[in-house]
Amino acid sequence: MLELNNKKNIAILFSGGVESTLLYYLTLKQTSSETNIKLFIIDRDNNPIERAFDLYNKLKILWNDTRTSLHILLIPETIPSHKKISNALNILNQEHDCVILGLNKYPSKKSIRPKLKGNTFNNTSILKMLNKFENLILPFIDLQKNQIIQMYYDYDIKEILQMTHSCGSPELKPCKICFNCRERIWAYNKLDKPLELGV
């Protein structure tokens, strides 16, 4: 899935969510011990930093990981939330062989998607913006959340799902009403598996 041959200096944008946690696992498994892997987190409206560090520290022990590190990537507060990712990519793209981002397709069910959004990124302003980063890897760009959750079962790491954080609100527990929670509920329903909303 990840084509990381000859990549010696890898950055992963990490939030502690379903996609970025799986990318952490896959990158660890598909690279050699000489590969330098750094995970970066940016602060957002749902305050992910504390949860992401908590998850990372647990996984580092569970996966016997001695190769990675997690860093807070400081983005100026003057930059609006919807531009923070592109700002982070600008910084990381200059310093790494590749940057891995867990962007995935929106659900096929229209009522779940954010208003006026299709379920692919073809010919969208987001994809045009991302295409300018030559070192960017988007392994999940054509996959929906249910397909990504299924990979946790395929790789026999499904117990990690309960430790991930998807909720887009700053609440202490998953709110169940934001897009991120509704997408996760939709994905589990589609897979016909018991719902695990995470932390």
Task: Outline where the language-model segments fall.
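Nucleotide-activated chemistry modules centered on ATP-dependent adenylation/adenylyltransferase
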Residues: 1-199
